[in-house]
Regions:
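Post-cleavage N-terminal segment of exported redox proteins
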Residues: 1-22, 69, 98-101
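Short hydrophobic/aromatic-rich motifs at helix boundaries and adjacent loops
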Residues: 3, 37-39, 61
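Extracytoplasmic electron-transfer domains, predominantly the class I c-type cytochrome c fold
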Residues: 49-101
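Electrostatic cytochrome c docking/interface patches
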Residues: 13-27, 43, 62-65
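Amphipathic alpha-helical interaction segments
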Residues: 16, 35-36, 63, 88
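A short linear-motif detector with a strong N-terminal bias
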Residues: 14, 32-36, 55-57
């Protein structure tokens, strides 16, 4: 019985990890892409107006710094701590890292 429970728990955890990337992409598309662009380049009309960084090239920040900006905002960017869970923020930081070319 314990073995079955362990196998089941492993499957659940693995499944959660698989959906994490899709969730981060959806969070990015819904909350970030209008300024930062789908690819993180910041070449949208709003991104150019605000002078956002090109995250496909410039990633000179730590994961903790990125999480802090996502949660609390910076400059004209609003914070998302009331909207996103810590797991969402962590997934979003990993997603931003994946945008680097």
């Amino acid at each position: 019985m314990k073995r079955k429970l362990l196998v089941f728990a492993t499957i659940i955890v693995a499944s959660a990890g698989i959906s994490l990337g899709a969730d981060a992409a959806a969070i990015w598309a819904q909350n970030c892409a209008s300024c930062h662009g789908k690819d993180g380049s910041g070449t949208t009309t709003m991104g150019k107006k605000l002078g956002v960084k090109d995250y496909s090239k410039d990633q000179g920040f730590s994961d903790a710094e990125a999480a802090n900006v996502i949660k609390n905002g910076k400059g004209k960017m609003k914070g998302y701590k009331a909207k996103l869970s810590d797991a969402d923020v962590k997934a979003l930081v990993a997603y931003v890292r994946s945008l680097k070319k």
